[in-house]
Amino acid sequence: YMERRVWVTARDGERIPVSLVWRRDVPTCDSAMFITGYGAYEISSDPGFAVSRISMLDRGVLYAVPGIRGGGEMGRAWYEQGHLLNKKHSFEDFIDATRALQRAGLASPLRTVANGGSAGGLLMGAVANMAPECYAGVEADVPFVDALTSILDPSLPLTVTEWDEWGDPLHDADVYAYMKSYTPYENAPDSEND
């Protein structure tokens, strides 16, 4: 197996690190791609070993982990550029990393699946809404997709502590409007079957 870190350029010019893992004897052009992200709480996402990934890698899937803003991959300032009123950088970075890898010929949108859980599930909902053309599928594990409704209720056990990460939309109209502009539930496209 091979691992390589590459750098891609986000729409605002920031350079985003992306870790790639693939099976050494499998060509990396037009592969199926499994791209996963988190981008919150200053937590770094690294392509650590997991036996469950071996089957996927053995089938020729390229495993990609972009270190998007909001995570801790590049230090405190990196985190600060991806939380509160900068949260959209996380989503844009993930989409831009996906597109850069696809433009490089590593995968096509028809063979790209995105994955994230919890806050990464919010990431998945946002990127599915913002750039559905980039992904054949999106897997959101325990997603935080109705973030605005949840974070408006201070009686919920985690709400007040979550204000440090997302902002306090209950008492700040700017935070409310910003969260409403990206939360997956608030921005889900209308069904064509209505």
Over which residues does each language-model region extend?
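Cap/lid segment of the alpha/beta-hydrolase catalytic domain
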Residues: 1-117, 152
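Active-site-proximal cap/loop segments of hydrolase catalytic domains
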Residues: 66-194
